[in-house]
Structure formats: C-alpha cells, structure tokens
C-alpha cells in the first residue's frame, strides 16, 4: 500500500508540474507572435518614413485589423506600406500622444510619434526627443496580468 501511495504521489506531482508549465508555454507562444508582429509593423513604419523623406505617417485612430494586414499611411493614398500580421494583433493606431494602456486588451498596438521608449521598455517618453522619433507600444500577456512593451523606431 505504501508503494502505491508513493507512486500516486509522484504521478500527482508530475501532473501538477505539467499543468503549471503548459499555460506559461502558451502565453510565451502568444507573446512571441505579438513581438514578431510588432517588429514587422515597426519595419513597415521605417520603410514608410524612408519612402516619404522622413515624414511620419498620418494618425490612424484605433483601426481594426482586417484581412490580416495593417496599412501604414492609409489616409494619404501614396506610398502606403502594408504589413501582414496574424490574428494576435487586434487593433492598430498611430497617434501623437500615447493612449494605450494595459486595459486596451492583449494585441492592441500603437505607434506613438515624437516619442521613444523609456529605460525599462514598458512605456514612452516624449520630452527631449526628436520630432522624427517614434516608438511602438503593444499590450502583451504577463504572468500577473497584461503588460505594456515598447520598441524604439
């Protein structure tokens, strides 16, 4: 009987470890997809800026991502950049002042013009930066709740 209890205890311990590890692996997979999409969007913004003599794209207010693509420069009709994204990106905006927060929902992506990432890469700063600077903020999934992540342009 004691041997059976020991085997059951070990099996239970293994099951607990597996049940704790699987959600973390799924979260990491979703965050990796978001990070890849965010970097692709930043590349698209960089290409747009290069093709338009350093001009940052016009503001886009919380556009829903449709057809698996984000259009940068959508209001100009000229020199647009289309970036393919997957379903992890839920909405996209280009703004002058940050409005995205952790309550915006996982997958929200925002390019903030005239800004750069703070030292911890969790928010943007707008003082003392070039008028051609831009940063991208996106909401990712953390172990204790949603978190903001930042990528400098």
Where are these regions (language model features)?
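Localized chelating/binding microdomains
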Residues: 7, 35-38, 42
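Short, surface-exposed interaction loops/tails
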Residues: 118-153
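Acidic, glycine-rich loop-and-strand cores that form catalytic or ligand-binding grooves
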Residues: 59-116
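N-terminal single-pass transmembrane signal-anchor helix
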Residues: 1-22
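Alpha-helix exit/C-cap motif
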Residues: 43-63
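Membrane-proximal amphipathic alpha-helices
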Residues: 26-38
């Amino acid at each position: 009987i004691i041997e059976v209890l020991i085997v059951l205890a070990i099996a239970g311990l293994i099951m607990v470890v597996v049940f704790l590890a699987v959600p973390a692996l799924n979260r990491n997979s979703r965050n990796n997809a978001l990070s890849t999409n965010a970097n692709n969007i930043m590349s698209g913004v960089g290409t747009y800026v290069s093709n338009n003599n350093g001009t940052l794209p016009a503001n886009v207010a919380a556009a829903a991502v449709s057809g698996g693509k984000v259009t940068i420069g959508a209001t100009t009709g000229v020199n647009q950049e289309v970036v393919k994204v997957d379903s992890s990106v839920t909405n996209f905006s280009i703004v002058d002042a940050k409005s995205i927060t952790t309550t915006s929902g996982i997958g929200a992506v925002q390019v903030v013009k005239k800004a750069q990432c703070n030292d911890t890469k969790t928010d943007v700063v707008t003082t003392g930066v070039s008028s051609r600077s831009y940063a991208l903020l996106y909401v990712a999934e953390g172990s204790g709740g949603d978190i903001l992540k930042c990528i400098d342009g």
